[in-house]
């Protein structure tokens, strides 16, 4: 898969790094970033791995965790959700209930059945998505948050329409309703849906996040 070309890029960048001072973390990042003429997830994945490794070297040399070098710890624990799934609506509900029983206060799931894109109109599979989200919300109750993961399956207009229909269930977030290629269109979805939008897992630089914000 994609790991092999990323390793090849790490090996390529390693030639520049040999013999250099590993403490010059930002300098090395900027040099490698600016000298990489063709960007993309492979190049940025390699650069990210190198950046993390340089921070790891510095932390080990100083005998401190990396968070101490970045301003210090801000919390002792974080809230987690459980991603749940199921082929049928009943399977999905049972999986969500099991997560709650295990102590999770939030569950994330994709509201579409595995065959949602086969022989169904958009209206049919959107109706099914609303039905599944409603069933999970009813099963877990008001004290548990639901997070709806769309996996970039819809166009902007479809994302807005489905998002508005899901507002009644008060999702904690609405994740990747559309492809992240256009920050402006994602902004339109966020503006027209009363649900927080979660996105960014396909971004590879801080500059993409800047455009989105």
Q: Where on the chain are the PLM-derived regions?
A:
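Metal- or metallocofactor-binding catalytic centers and their adjacent structured scaffolds
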Residues: 1-61
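Conserved, mostly hydrophobic/aromatic
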Residues: 13, 50, 63, 107, ...
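Short glycine/serine/threonine/alanine-rich loop segments
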Residues: 19, 64, 104, 195
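Active-site nucleophile and cofactor-binding loops and adjacent substrate-binding regions
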Residues: 47, 85, 178, 201-205
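Glycine-rich, aromatic-flanked loop segments that form ligand/cofactor-binding clefts
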Residues: 53-87
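Active-site phosphate/pyrophosphate- and oxyanion-stabilizing loops and adjacent acidic/basic residues
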Residues: 56, 68, 72, 134, ...
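Metal-dependent enolase-superfamily TIM-barrel catalytic cores that perform enediolate-based chemistry
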Residues: 77-192
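Catalytic alpha/beta core domains of metabolic enzymes, predominantly
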Residues: 181-213
């Amino acid at each position: 898969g994609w790991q092999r070309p990323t390793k090849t890029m790490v090996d390529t960048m390693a030639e520049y790094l040999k013999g250099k001072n590993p403490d010059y973390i930002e300098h090395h990042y900027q040099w490698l970033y600016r000298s990489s003429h063709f960007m993309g997830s492979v190049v940025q994945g390699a650069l990210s791995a190198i950046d993390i490794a340089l921070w790891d070297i510095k932390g080990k040399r100083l005998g401190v965790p990396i968070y101490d070098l970045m301003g210090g710890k801000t919390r002792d624990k974080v809230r987690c959700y459980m991603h749940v799934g199921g082929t049928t609506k009943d399977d999905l509900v049972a999986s969500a209930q099991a997560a709650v029983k295990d102590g999770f206060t939030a569950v994330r799931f994709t509201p579409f059945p595995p065959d949602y894109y086969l022989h169904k109109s958009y209206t049919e599979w959107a109706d099914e998505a609303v039905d599944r989200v409603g069933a999970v919300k009813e099963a877990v109750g008001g004290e548990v948050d639901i997070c709806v993961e769309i996996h970039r399956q819809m166009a902007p207009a479809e994302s807005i329409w489905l998002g508005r229909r899901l507002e009644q269930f008060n999702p904690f977030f609405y994740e990747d309703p559309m492809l992240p290629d256009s920050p402006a269109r994602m902004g339109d979805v966020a503006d027209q849906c009363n649900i927080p939008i979660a996105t960014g897992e396909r971004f590879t630089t801080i500059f993409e996040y800047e455009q989105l914000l």
